Amino acid sequence: MQPLGERIVVQREESETTTAGGIVLPDSAKEKPARGTVVALGTGKLLDDGSRADFQLAAGDRVLFSSYAGETVEVDDTEYLLMREDDVLAVIE
């Protein structure tokens, strides 16, 4: 999947399946983590002079994003988030 413009594709990290006390959580009780890995970048934001801005992110970066960021897209049984670069809050090092 190749995003357009200033959009990026992020693969969300898997959520924990058990609690610290050993209780197995059903899918309905799991919170989706707001962390993931950037897998693809668009062409960059179009600037007023017609050029494209460089991304501050790179493919492979682990990122923290707003829990309401992006649109969920499923490709080949894998779930991805399609979001704007501005939705990313931080890079996890």
From Swiss-Prot:
InterPro entries the UniProt entry points to: Chaperonin_GroES, Chaperonin_GroES_sf, Chaprnonin_Cpn10_CS, GroES-like_sf
GO terms under biological process: chaperone cofactor-dependent protein refolding
Family under the similarity heading: Belongs to the GroES chaperonin family.
GO CC terms, sorted: cytoplasm
Functional note: Together with the chaperonin GroEL, plays an essential role in assisting protein folding. The GroEL-GroES system forms a nano-cage that allows encapsulation of the non-native substrate proteins and provides a physical environment optimized to promote and accelerate protein folding. GroES binds to the apical surface of the GroEL ring, thereby capping the opening of the GroEL channel.
Region: Disordered, residue numbers: 1-20
Keywords for the protein's UniProt record, in alphabetical order: Chaperone, Cytoplasm
Oligomer status and interactors: Heptamer of 7 subunits arranged in a ring. Interacts with the chaperonin GroEL.
Pfam families: Cpn10
Upper taxonomic lineage: Bacteria, Pseudomonadati, Planctomycetota, Planctomycetia, Pirellulales
Localization, UniProt: Cytoplasm
Record protein name field: Co-chaperonin GroES 2
Record-linked SMART domains: Cpn10
GO MF annotations, alphabetized: ATP binding; metal ion binding; protein folding chaperone; protein-folding chaperone binding; unfolded protein binding
Keyword Phosphoprotein attached: no
